[in-house]
Each structure stands twice: as structure tokens, then as C-alpha cells.
Amino acid sequence: MSLKYYLNDLSDSDSESESECAEGSSPQDEQNGFYDYRSPPDSADTSIFEDTGRSSSERPMSPTEVCSTDFEEKVPFSSELVVIPESMLKKREEYGRFFSNFKKAIYHLPADEEEWDRQERLHQSFIEMFGRKYPPELSEILKSDEYYEKRCLDLGCGTGCWIKEVARDFPYCEAVGVDLVVVPDTRDFPPNLRCEMDDVNLGLQHFFGRFDVVHARLLSSGIKDYQLLIENIARTLRPGGLVELQEYDFHIYDCNRRRFELSTNELAPPWWPRWMTFFNEAIRKMQGDVDAATHLLKWVRTHPGFEQVRYEERWIPIIPGNLDPLEPMYARLQADVSVYLRSGRPLLLKSGLSEMEVDILENNAIREFYESETTQYTRLQCVCARRNNAVLDHLPPSYNFR
């Protein structure tokens, strides 16, 4: 079985089955560990068309495939149909959870049913938290009566929940999602939505100058250099385009909104901040940019390519303590943190903690959620900005990771 999908890198090559190149790729492709989605195999599998009795050019497109004959004029950077070998669709199993098979991936939360369900619920909570799906400017930017005149890019799209909303609400735009794994369920994808399988740490050069909106939410744990990501986004946006960035800072705050400053030298209360301290350190070991949220506003505000910079933050009382009864949305977020603890467990174990140590952190944090009388906050920091007309220098060759 092969899935029609965009592919920008190969899986980890630790085993023979995992290191197979797509059929038709050259030995040099295999050596470089990179399969360019703009250079498809000559012998692409078209068996999915056989039951229709129609050629691929006659058959309606599915959301996860694309042919240049259908899109070459509407989407200049689209390419031939690419077939991903079954080995690329496999996931790595670690500590009972499943993960992206991308080599050297920094992001280390699971890609399985439990985590996808959490992401879907979190998306709905974000809508309630902000009272809107999108920044106010987005509607005006994406409004068009011409197919694919406007384009929207979602980096780290996960289940595709945000980019699906965009594709439905703006049916004339082209919506593109990028993630380390294949989107789990594409059956309800609108026809103007497609996805790419890629690691954004490798750069966005193939997108430069082609999008009107770029959205990135909760990516920092999987990004090696977030400031460099902003450089890439600035070059991806067209003049007048919009960027929206939303990140947590991987710290917990007390009832006075002061940061807990704890160490990983002991297992002691407060437990939720202690768990987050260990998690913060584990992400650092994987080279994730855990400090990105703290610097988002400065990085965007001082960038020569952006203007009309706007900052918002939300203080989320994950542990309500003595606060008045929470809105249902915050209660759901609190419940979802228990799922988040389980999702973070493999990374804590990978960082060197024992099963017993992780159990102590996790069980006491959950107890603290429901028994503590002291309010504890998580801080969400958000930056929106418009792309101005400034012509930016090319990124140095050292930034071309591919």
C-alpha cells in the first residue's frame, strides 16, 4: 500500500526496512537521506486509479495527492505525484507510544490516537480562549473569488484541525499543512487542502514568496532555532501577508504570576512545576528551543520584514486553587494536562529518568491538580504581524540545511 503525499525527507535509516528509498530514487538520494518531493519516481504507482477506469489526469484529486497537470498553472510550486513507500508510513515505538519516523527529529511527543485526540480538544479550547478561530486580519487577507490566488500555510499542522477550518471557511484559497507525520484522517479534507510530510528545521526555501498567511502553534519543543524559523517565515510571506505564532514557555507560574524557579536535583513539591522543570530540561537535551516563547515578541518586532506587530498572552489556571469555579473550557484544559503528562513520559524516560522517578513526578502532579489550594498558571504567548515590502537578504548558505 502506498499513500499519495508530499514527501520532503526520508525516515530514519536504522534498519533495512526503514531505510528504503521510494521506488525510482537514485543511490545518491539514498546517500543524502533526502527525497525531493519535486523529483518523483518515474514508476509512480497509479493502481489507486484502476478501479475507476480513468487515468490519473481524469480522476478527481484526493486531499493528499497532487498532479502537476492539474495544478501547474494554479499552484506554480506544486509538482508531480509522489508515492511514499510503506516503510515511510511506519512509526517508531518507544516506551509503548508511537512517534514520527523522521531521522533526527527534535519534536518528541507521540503521534498516536491519544495525542491526536488531545490536540483536537486543545484546538477547540484555543477557539474558546480567544473567542475566535483566527486573527482579525486573516479574513480580509484570504478573501478572494479566484481559486488559489491566496495561500495559507500551517507549520506543524498535527491532525490538521486548524488548517481544515481555514480551507472550509475560505474555499477559494489553497491551504497547505506541514507535519512530521501523515495527517491521521484525511476523509473530511476539503478539496483545497493538501499536506506535506517534512521537518521544518530543514528550511522552507521551496515556499519562499508564495504564501499570504503562515500559522505556527506550539512548535518550539520541536524547533532547533526558532529565530531562524522566523527568518524563513518572513521570506515565505508575500508583502501584506500575516504571521501568527503561539507558544508556551515551558514554565509554571504561581498565584502572583511569578515563575517557579526549580532544579532537577530533587524530587519534591510543588509537583506540577517540578514535572515541567524536568520536561523543560528533557526538551533542551533534544535541542528544542524551549525559550522561544519568551523572545517571540522581540524577534518579530525587531525583524526588518515585519510591521503592525501585535502581542497577546493568556494566563491559564491549570491548577485553579482557590479561584472561583472555572469556565468549562479551563476545566477541559486541566483534564487534558493529565494526557499531556502521559505524552511527555517517553521523553522524560529518554532523558535518563527511571520509571520510578517519572511515576513519582506524574502521580504527584496529577494529585496536585485536584488537591492543591494554590493557583498555578501556564502562560501562552502569541504574536501576530504583517509582512512589509522590505526586500530581505538571502539566508547564508549555512542555513540551507538540506
From Swiss-Prot:
GO terms for biological process: methylation; sporulation resulting in formation of a cellular spore. Its EC number is 2.1.1.-. It catalyses: L-methionyl-[protein] + S-adenosyl-L-methionine = S-methyl-L-methionyl-[protein] + S-adenosyl-L-homocysteine. This is Secondary metabolism regulator laeA. Its main location: nucleus. GO terms for cellular component: nucleus. Keywords: Methyltransferase, Nucleus, S-adenosyl-L-methionine, Sporulation, Transcription, Transcription regulation, Transferase. It comes from Coprinopsis cinerea (strain Okayama-7 / 130 / ATCC MYA-4618 / FGSC 9003). Induction: Moderately expressed during the development but expression is induceded in the mycelium stage. The keyword Methyltransferase applies. Belongs to the methyltransferase superfamily. LaeA methyltransferase family. It is an enzyme of class 2 (transferase). It is found in: Nucleus. It comes from the Eukaryota. Residues 11-21 have a biased composition (Acidic residues). Methyltransferase that performs automethylation. No other methyl-accepting substrate has been identified yet. Acts as a global regulator for secondary metabolite gene expression. Negatively regulates the production of coprinoferrin, a structurally novel acylated tripeptide hydroxamate siderophore. GO terms for molecular function: methyltransferase activity. Residues 1-70 are annotated as: Disordered.
